[in-house]
């Protein structure tokens, strides 16, 4: 699974272990969104991935990934994830600093472009010295609020697989009302970040957002390669 990572994070972290790429940025579930925090804004999130029962492909586990994201100005945000916290078994703690830049935001046409990079720095039970995840994305927001995201990624070896991996990353967001959004994202490929995650995003209060999804592996899904993903985020200002 996602590097138990969460993911590809669990990632990647996202190595995150095994469950989620643990991306130190604003995301849909695992795939980065094209949102960028304004200068001085601070956002914190805790991701929890878990599988309550054993299966052929994936054993019972739980994983927790905290992250913080800060708006740096000039359409740039920076972040930090702490991945590799997995039970049962030894932790493989990994620091994941990240940066996201939005070079284009259409005012009326709904288009946006972002570029991003994550550096993976294992600090405990290290399986490799350092790794990298780089991506480019474009999104289109329609008048009804629907947003579609598509892009490409590259993971260096040992982050989500023993070899370098490249592919596509995609997202879908459909607001139902001011408090509820149906969403899904997907990393292509057969590696620890290769999951499709549908779910819902819901506003708990003016500063708190909840996420509930279910990650389904691109391979061995019929043998149990799937798990729950819960996230809670807080906007400090």
Language model features by range: what are they?
Residues 23-158, 172-181, 185-237:
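Transmembrane beta-barrel domains of Gram-negative outer membranes and organellar outer membranes
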Residues 1-28, 237:
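Cleavable N-terminal export/targeting peptides
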Residues 163-170:
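Short loop-to-alpha-helix "cap/lid" segments that border enzyme active sites
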């Amino acid at each position: 699974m996602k590097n138990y990572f969460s993911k590809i994070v669990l990632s990647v972290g996202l190595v995150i272990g095994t469950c989620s790429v643990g991306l130190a940025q604003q995301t849909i579930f695992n795939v980065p969104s094209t949102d960028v925090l304004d200068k001085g804004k601070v956002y914190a999130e805790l991701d929890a991935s878990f599988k309550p029962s054993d299966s052929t492909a994936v054993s019972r586990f739980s994983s927790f990934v905290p992250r913080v994201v800060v708006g740096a100005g000039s359409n740039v945000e920076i972040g930090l994830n702490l991945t590799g916290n997995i039970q049962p078994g030894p932790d493989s703690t990994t620091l994941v600093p990240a940066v996201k830049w939005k070079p284009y935001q259409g005012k009326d046409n709904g288009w946006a472009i972002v570029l991003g990079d994550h550096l993976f720095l294992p600090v405990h039970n290290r399986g490799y010295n350092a790794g990298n995840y780089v991506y480019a994305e474009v999104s289109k927001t329609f008048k009804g609020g629907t947003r579609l995201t598509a892009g490409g990624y590259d993971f260096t070896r040992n982050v989500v697989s023993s070899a370098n991996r490249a592919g596509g990353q995609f997202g879908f967001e459909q607001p139902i009302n001011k408090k509820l959004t149906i969403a899904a994202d997907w990393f292509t490929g057969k590696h620890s970040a290769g999951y499709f995650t549908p779910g819902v995003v819901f506003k708990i209060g003016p500063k708190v957002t909840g996420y509930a999804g279910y990650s389904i592996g691109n391979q061995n899904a019929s043998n149990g390669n799937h798990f729950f993903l819960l996230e809670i985020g807080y906007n400090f200002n």
